[in-house]
Amino acid sequence: MASKKKKIQVTIELKTREELNPYLAPTYPKVVIVDGYHPFWGRCDVAEIMLKRFQEEPANANKVDWLSIPYEQIADIVPKEKNEKGEVIEVGSKPKYFIFVKGEFFVSINGIDLPKLREEIYKSYAKFEETTN
């Protein structure tokens, strides 16, 4: 009988704002990246592989927590993005990541753009260090 491989999960799955609040405390010791997903579409499982590889890199060890929560639980604490016509862009099937540093919103990234995500994460590390010293 073949054994099933256990899936190693990188993302901490949350359902409510109350579960998220401790991660957004000004004293939280890591950068926090939130996948704010639309409940109909769900989390982006494809991104999990990239996140796992990213977190395994020594430079990133113990510096970041990846969270996943339905967008409506964070809609009031993240800025609304607008298109060229000034219309609010709703969260849909494309992943949307929000980075927080010491409880403050830092930046959002649309889609699975790993180079852009890495760039913004490294900027958030610098901001974290700047506010720690």
Describe each model-derived feature in a short phrase.
Residues E90-N133:
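Non-catalytic, surface beta->alpha helical segment in thiol-disulfide oxidoreductase systems
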Residues M1-V31, N62, K116-N133:
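N-terminal leader/targeting and pre-domain segments
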Residues R43, I49, P95-F98:
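Proline-centered helix-kink/hinge sites
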Residues K80-S93:
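A short glycine-leucine-enriched loop at secondary-structure breakpoints
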Residues I33-Y37, I99:
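Structural cue for short, hydrophobic secondary-structure segments
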Residues V31, W41-G42:
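Structural hallmark of WD40 beta-propellers
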